[in-house]
Amino acid sequence: MDPAPTTPSRPPGSIRRTSSIDTARPDGLRGDLFITARARDLRTDLDGTASVVGEAELDARVDGTTRELRSLVTMPALPALDLLIGTVVGPGFRRRLADEVPREQEVGSLLHLLLDDLPGAALVSGYALQRGGALEDLEPRAASPEGSTAGAAALGVRDDLCAGWAHDATMMVTIRTRGAIPMAMGPPAPILEPPDDPWSWHEMPPLAPHAMRRRRRLDVLPSTAPETAHGVDVHFRDSHMDADGAESVVHEYSVSGAVEGVEGRVTAMAARARVLPWMECPAAVASADRLIGMPVGELRTWVRREMTGASTCTHLNDTLRALGDVTVLASALDNTDAGDTPGV
């Protein structure tokens, strides 16, 4: 497994959705989590001309201990989002989001993509604490009896959540026997922005030491005729910046597939594991083909409900859920009026 060395060129007649969520703790590793998130939709015309059809931003502060949302500022502004203040950015957050701003998911907005991805980004940000040594005095070190789950319980984890956390996988065995979560070290993160394409990604600020970045790219390719399949090409990466300014990959997947028809039914889907922390993790890629035959409009709900357990991966699931926006993006390819495009 190797990380992607760069980003592919933008095919003429395509639309590209990119997003990034940076998580940092400027007040120290035990301090609050500051989140900076950006997203953009970019259409590439047949002559190669690039045009921005939508942008969104958010800045948030999350309590470093309770994970409660302390502040949230978004562009575009949505007053209803004030009701999320005090909500734990974890289990239940997406359900609360759907209750307060249901239309954002319905229209596949960029802002919804960022908000929906906050729980995953906040969860993964804990890796920075581990790398920085901030968890060492919090982890119980006594080994548990063979076959016991006491060590896992003490660390607040439950086995069989995903392929990497399966009961007999490296992660859980180490927790049971050593009373500590093992630390994975990923490869250096190649720069994804090709020097010959300034439009390949939206602008992102420099990543601070001990910060993490979650970035996504979704390319929807032109169909060859009305109601024929749109190809999709997807990339996902979690990365960490260490104290010395070296960025490494924590998780990385690529996904390819096809979506066909007015309702956007999945006709092909395959995932590739590029970088994953444990040797058991790549087994989850086989779960991607479960989406074949599904309408993409149902993916966000269906994947969250049905794709659970040791044959799946939380991060791959979120990548597959984001395909729920494909039909909305595909409609922009045939829409010459930027004011009607879905990105804002």
Which positions does each model-derived feature cover?
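Active-site- and interface-proximal helix/loop "cap" or "latch" segments in soluble metabolic
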Residues: 2-190, 240-344
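Long, positively charged binding patches that form subdomain-scale interaction surfaces
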Residues: 169-249
